[in-house]
Amino acid sequence: MYVHVLFVWQFECRAIIMLDMTKTAAQDLAEFLGDDEFGTVLADPPWRFVNRTGKVAPEHKRLARYPTMELEDICALPVAEHLADRAHCYLWVPNALLPEGLAVLQAWGFEYKSNIIWHKIRKDGGSDGRGVGFYFRNVTEILLFGTRGKNVRTEAPGRRQVNMIQSRKREHSRKPDEQYRIIEGCSWGPYLELFGRGIREGWTVWGNQADADYKPDWKTYSYNSGLAAE
């Protein structure tokens, strides 16, 4: 099930919510976006891991955080059809799925250029070693950066921006809000967020958690080191 939430920011915030359990994600997104085009896309897809039953997996039977998508279905999302001639993409990908992330960038019409690393830290500033991983204990996630078109260098702030975010974790899989300040300073709009949680002024947000009243509801929420969205 996908929830359409379209927000128009003028003097107030208005939401249009439509539910349809029969459509594919690609069909749903195409109808939601209509004829709109965007200069910057931010996406945090629900990646499917080989181990879908582990305790940290999104589809863990007891915790059941959220459904995931096959790589081919993520690639099939009609992102390229809704891009301006000059566009940027910021794509979150787990360390173990870097090749898949690069494949999605290409499928959406972008060329990989660089990345931003999110370093998850504790209260005292040290690495939050509660992450998982088969080979190493992961304390980072990757935000891939890709471009489309000509004359697509980042805006002036980007040339001073280091490619690292250091912040504490919040609920499972939620990404740091620091990303928005970086993206809005380095890239131009209109802005589109795919698989977003909650809403943000000045952005078009699509996803089944793109709701003004979004609150995490899984049990692991209370164990994470940071606070939820205010």
Which functions belong to the PLM regions below?
Residues 2-230:
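Class I S-adenosyl-L-methionine-dependent methyltransferase catalytic core
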